[in-house]
Regions:
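Short acidic, glycine-rich loop/turn motifs
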Residues: 15-20, 43, 78-80, 93-95, ...
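Short, well-ordered strand-loop elements centered on a beta-strand within folded domains, enriched
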Residues: 37-40, 83-90, 118-126
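A hydrophobic, small-residue-rich beta->alpha segment in the mid-to-C-terminal subdomain
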Residues: 107-150
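Phosphate/ribose-recognition catalytic cores of enzymes acting on nucleotide-derived substrates
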Residues: 53-96, 102, 106-109
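Short acidic-glycine loop/turn motifs at beta-strand connectors
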Residues: 32-35, 80-81, 114-118
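Cysteine/selenocysteine-centered motifs that mediate thiol-based redox chemistry or coordinate metal-sulfur cofactors
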Residues: 147-166
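Charge-rich, low-complexity N-terminal segments
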Residues: 1-60
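A short, polar/proline- and glycine-enriched secondary-structure boundary/capping micro-motif
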Residues: 48-53, 99-100, 130-134
Length: 166
């Protein structure tokens, strides 16, 4: 193997929800500036997941952005043909990296922005309310709601997440 054919750095993304591992999957590390970590991974779900407003399916590729100091992650979703489907955002505690693992705790709230920017929707607010986080950790709940509001404010702009992800 020549020096020019180095394998890309890999890590495992671990998504935790309510103290349990929800999903774990391998990803290619694209960058880590000490605060923002970006990775690329194929759709890690089994089969097709149809939300009604978007379908995640085998062949889709996610370019995912995580922050060590922000309460969210942003995932650009592309179809197998390379076309952008949109951006799926998870409200999370700040990401924690440890060795070859990136651990992210999902706080139930989500946001979707379609590729054309016409469909911006808040998701799973009912799950968040039922989670009890506002009672068990009011500071985290407040940070989660503020993060969702901040992402929505970016999502409705004509340039969407362009500046955030640049």
């Amino acid at each position: 193997m020549s020096a020019n054919s180095a394998e890309p750095a890999r890590l495992e993304v671990v998504l935790v929800k309510a103290g349990r591992t929800k999903i774990r999957y391998p990803a290619e590390l694209l960058g880590d500036d000490g605060n923002r970590i970006s990775v690329r991974a194929p759709w890690a779900g089994s089969g097709v997941r149809d939300f009604g407003f978007v379908r995640f399916e085998p062949g889709d590729v996610f370019t995912e952005y995580y922050w060590r100091d922000r309460w969210y992650s942003v995932k650009e979703v592309r179809a197998a043909d390379g076309s952008v489907k949109g951006w799926y955002c998870d409200i999370t505690r700040p990401a924690v990296s440890s060795g070859a693992q990136l651990v992210v705790e999902d706080l139930d709230l989500d946001l979707w922005r379609s590729a054309d920017g016409r469909d911006v929707r808040r998701l799973d607010e009912d799950e968040f309310a039922e989670s009890g986080l506002t009672e068990t950790d009011p500071e985290a709940a407040s940070a989660a709601v503020a993060a969702l509001d901040a992402l929505e404010a970016l999502a409705i702009r004509p340039d969407g997440f362009a500046r955030l992800l640049a």
